[in-house]
């Protein structure tokens, strides 16, 4: 490659990236996933689009996509709270294993019938599109206030289901490439255990070593993020090299670092946020360039049948069977999880495997995977907000600070500065600071008014437009945000958690005469907390609801996994 070609490469790459960034606001206006914008830019720049760029280097696409996916999973792991595993780990693992296998089987049979393929070839198509995509799920769920059980299950599933899909894809390619070779069940079982076992061990072990290394190192501030990124990629590559799941390993590395006091954690997350955006743009641009839309014309009708068959039948069946042991999931939860089986980059990456192996029909597999991804992003991704509202798994948006930044006083400091801007409808307007019930361990460090820094005292009264800088820790974030939150304008949001609240240590016997509750066959000392556990199980989450006798009960407050208060909606009001 000469200097002119290199400059042309830089020019085209930078131009496509800039166009993708500038077009990204269209995502919210059109109600479509932002990843689809990046993919569309790549397709338009490609062979059949106005750009006319001929790109058919599957090896380069595979390299770029795997690197990008590793970075996205590292960032996603660092932002996942281990506390969510309390309610979502086992359901997510069931979906990541049994769910993928069931989806693969049903989708594979449909593909074999629709495209007149051998049943093994059909299963290969099913395996390629069988897993949900972490990049798509993390991107579309980011910033959404979903029921914790549902949101965490979807995120953990997307971060851990790729090993199963990779295992099935690689195994089926090996069988199809050597049809005369018999592969024993024990061999396949050992391969499966190796993928998951090595992936988990190297992810957690490598995460611990990297965490120790980061905290013991004394580096320039900007180098910690590079150390984490390079360390994560080392573990990712080592896991793949040894036969484990690099995807699972790097997700667990991020999970370990994100849930431990890590030196420079906030700076690392800021850098990873930018790297994740670059990775998403680069990955979907390259995959878009790889597609020749005219090749999809011949598979249009059966392709739609396959995509909608997977969305409307295979995925729901897999979800309902996989979640059978978990009674805490309501029917609405299950339907929403079924609908958010988003496909993205991973199926396209897996579709490159047969191309690189030189399998007959590999181009068909690739085109089918791409078509399914396009339909999934357009149909499921674009309707995510509507689906969440219909399934009633979306909680009222949590009040959050305008910005937050770390205060790196100590190597593993967890102190942060939260910035709040007070509008006229904030609850605390007009109140002196001394009357604010500030959470323990927090302090208002500064108040800005009309671009002027005030020296706050107990008598300082807050005004609309004030900007507050509050020093505290993440554990106090919810209490602070509620204190400085805006009064909800939407009446439905106001009523989501009920007409009034009661604490869970209240005895039902005390409520019975007020609300006409019948307590036959119930213990005299039964509390509201006991009722919640009997109705929702041991691990309820914020927003969980149930109807009991004439009242509608909603979990309205949690502390360290325990329900602290419950909202009650009166029977005279219409129930959700």
From Swiss-Prot:
Record keyword Transmembrane present: yes
Keywords from the named record: Antiport, Cell inner membrane, Cell membrane, Ion transport, Membrane, Potassium, Potassium transport, Transmembrane, Transmembrane helix, Transport
Annotated RCK C-terminal domain residues: 405-486
Cystines in this chain: none
Membrane topology: Multi-pass membrane protein
Record-linked Gene3D superfamilies: 1.20.1530.20, Regulator of K+ conductance, C-terminal domain
SMART domains named in the record: CorC_HlyC
Pfam family name, one: Na_H_Exchanger
Location of the protein in the cell: Cell inner membrane
Biological process according to GO: cell volume homeostasis
Catalytic activity as recorded in UniProt: K(+)(in) + H(+)(out) = K(+)(out) + H(+)(in)
A GO cellular component annotation in the UniProt record: plasma membrane
Keyword Transmembrane: yes
Alphabetized GO MF terms: flavin adenine dinucleotide binding; potassium:proton antiporter activity
Membrane spanning residue stretches: 6-26, 34-54, 58-78, 87-107, 109-129, 163-183, 185-205, 219-239, 242-262, 271-291, 299-319, 335-355, 359-379
InterPro entries: Cation/H_exchanger_TM (IPR006153), FAD-bd_PCMH-like_sf (IPR036318), Na+/solute_symporter_sf (IPR038770), NhaP2 (IPR023729), RCK_C (IPR006037), RCK_C_sf (IPR036721), Transptr-assoc_dom (IPR005170)
Family: Belongs to the monovalent cation:proton antiporter 1 (CPA1) transporter (TC 2.A.36) family. NhaP2 subfamily.
PANTHER family associated with the record: K(+)_H(+) ANTIPORTER NHAP2 (PTHR32507:SF7), NA(+)/H(+) ANTIPORTER 1 (PTHR32507)
Function text: K(+)/H(+) antiporter that extrudes potassium in exchange for external protons and maintains the internal concentration of potassium under toxic levels.
Full protein name: K(+)/H(+) antiporter NhaP2
